Amino acid sequence: MSTMKKEERLVNKVTRLLRRANIPRWLHHYGPKKFETYVLCIGLLIKQIYQLSYRRAAKLLAEYYSIDIHFTTLQKAAKRLPRSIWQSLLAATIEFKNTHLAAADGTGFTRSGPSQYYMKRIDRKTLVGKPVQAITMIDVEKRKFLAGCFFAKPHGEAKQVSRLHKQSPTVPDVLLMDKGFDAEYLHQWLNEHGTFSVAPVRKNCVRGRHRKLMRECMDWCLYWQRNIVESLFSALKRLFGTSIKSQKSPMINAELFCRLIAYNIGLRLWTFS
């Protein structure tokens, strides 16, 4: 496939997502209407796919897409685009209506800080900076990310499952979780909202109707399919990198949501080679 057709395919995918998510053509009400929403989204997606800086992403847009945009425009877009827009775009990548089996888990992304060589030279023993926490929900059968939430500081994973469940475009019938998500209030909330949760019971936890059911009738063959979420985390880090360059929460959300969106719609570095 020629380079021109690949460029048109990327533009068509992004514009189709924006229409499906009901995102306006312009994100600001006042001021000059110079760059449409799809231009900003393409620039931020390309930055994550190629793992570029903002300057090089703007230069690539100018050379291959004939879009003359300053790199600070992309920086401001990453900072100002609300999290709801990114979640709407991620939900727009899901074209199926039913999710039989889903899984939720968390992972971490390192911050781009001093290198290990520099740390060794200054005789630093302790770690510098805290990793970015990512908690996501995936469709096990389709291998797609349904929802995600990201934090610059550590948060309780079990408390975010209800948030992921509400943001998911489809309601999963069964949700697989590891032992860290075992909480009776969470199991009850999921049952009330049409999802049966499967998670191993914590040690020395005896109270709770759902926990008693899991202790007596745990389906381990079904539970081990939860490993698919670990495979998706591995693929995400191998394709788009293991580190985060941004420091502020809005820009961290933009970086990680762009990676999830690019993965769901099949944008890889090898598709542009």
Annotate the PLM regions.
Residues 30-41, 46-49, 83, 87-192, ...:
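Polybasic low-complexity intrinsically disordered regions
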Residues 50-56, 240-244, 265-273:
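Short helix-capping/linker segments at secondary-structure and domain boundaries
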Residues 2-48:
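Basic, short loop/linker segments at the boundary and entry of helix-turn-helix/winged-helix-like folds
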Residues 174, 179-246:
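Helix-centered, glycine/charged polyanion-binding patches within enzymatic domains
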Residues 67-83:
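Major-groove recognition helix of helix-turn-helix-like DNA-binding domains
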Residues 54-67:
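DNA-recognition alpha helix
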Residues 247-273:
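Charge-patterned, long linear interaction tracts outside catalytic cores
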